[in-house]
Amino acid sequence: FNFPVAVWNWNSALAWICGDTCVWKASEKAPLCAIACQNIWNEVANENNLPEGISCIINGDYRVGELITKDERISLVSATGSTRMGRIVGAEVAKRFGKSLLELGGNNAIIITPEADLDVTIIGALFGAVGTCGQRCTSTRRLIIHEKIYEEVKNKLSSAYKQLKIGNPLDEKNHVGPLIDKDAVNTYLKAIEKAVSEGGNVLVEGGVLTGEGFESGCYVKPVIIEAENYYEIVQDETFAPILYLMKYSEIEEAIDMQNGVKQGLSS
């Protein structure tokens, strides 16, 4: 749901170039994007005298998705979403000896060395953590900071978070928009609770915003938590604006921490 048009575009365009047709099952959380793109495709197809059926859409929840994963006429399934979803899709498609392309979760970190330009680093870490309200597989989840500069980074970042403006993402003055739905909000709240129960120290408090402009109940405050890399909650991706801070002393230790999670990494 976070990049609904882009995900469709980079998958379907390649398939068309190779002479294949596509059936697109959009996220049930962003179905109108699929309809809008299909309308554009229909115009292009009509202008170029292309037959119907090259691009098709179906909308619905996971039960509709199961129709695709189990259909032996569909030789390749490309799926973007959670790691949990990927395990199900990959196994189901493999049962019929089909092929799957899976773009799943990420648990990305930034390693901050003593030589780093902290002003540039803070901007990058801030955008990486709160951009799209933390709802990207490429979002920054962890900051691995050298012990010599840990306090300085912590203080500068906490100060920067206090300047964030939360609201309608169509307003260019705002930095952070909403989470996708109430389920995502509950996951966000449970993640904070879990981090604290494991020993985490909350530096920048979270919470759900209320009042004018926040009637949906999906606008939340970005959070910073001091944590350890081995915490269960840190080891698993949370699709929300929660950033974990941790220390290192030697670069080899930092690299081990960076790689020491189950999900993939972006750079």
Regions from the PLM with identified roles:
Residues 1-120, 248:
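Rossmann-like NAD(P) dinucleotide-binding subdomain of oxidoreductase/dehydrogenase enzymes
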Residues 7, 231-235:
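Cytochrome P450 core scaffold surrounding the K-helix E-X-X-R motif
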Residues 33-37, 136, 237, 257:
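Short acidic/histidine- and often glycine-rich active-site loop of Leloir-type glycosyltransferases
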Residues 43, 84-229, 247, 251-252, ...:
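ALDH superfamily catalytic-core signature
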Residues 66-72, 235-237, 256:
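Short acidic alpha-helix that forms the nucleotide-activated donor recognition element
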Residues 241:
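Glycine-rich nucleotide-phosphate-binding loops and adjacent flexible coil segments
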